[in-house]
């Protein structure tokens, strides 16, 4: 890590981080929540397939 740049206060304020992921495409930080639609869609489809497969296994 020899190539390091010290960030100014203005540059630091533009960084958004510390968001919490709920594992289904929903993220929240201390100001707002948002949805990653691709991740949410994948989570929903995965849940549907899992439910369908477990239903077949119970037959």
Swiss-Prot record:
It holds the Pfam family Bacteriocin_II. One of its GO terms (biological process) is defense response to bacterium. It is found in: Secreted. Disulfide bonds join 28-33. It comes from the Bacteria. GO terms for cellular component: extracellular region. Residues 1-18 form a propeptide. PROSITE patterns: BACTERIOCIN_IIA (PS60030). Keywords: Antibiotic, Antimicrobial, Bacteriocin, Disulfide bond, Secreted. Bactericidal activity; inhibits closely related Lactobacilli, Listeria monocytogenes and ivanovvi, Enterococcus faecalis, Carnobacterium sp and Brocothrix thermosphacta. NCBIfam families: bacteriocin_sig (TIGR01847). Belongs to the bacteriocin class IIA/YGNGV family. This is Bacteriocin sakacin-A. It comes from Latilactobacillus sakei (Lactobacillus sakei).
């Amino acid at each position: 890590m020899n190539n390091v740049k010290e960030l100014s206060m203005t540059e630091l304020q533009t960084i958004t981080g510390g968001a919490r992921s709920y594992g289904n495409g929903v993220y929240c930080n201390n100001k707002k929540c948002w949805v990653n639609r691709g991740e949410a869609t994948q989570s929903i489809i995965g849940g549907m397939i899992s439910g369908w497969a477990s239903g077949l296994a119970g037959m």
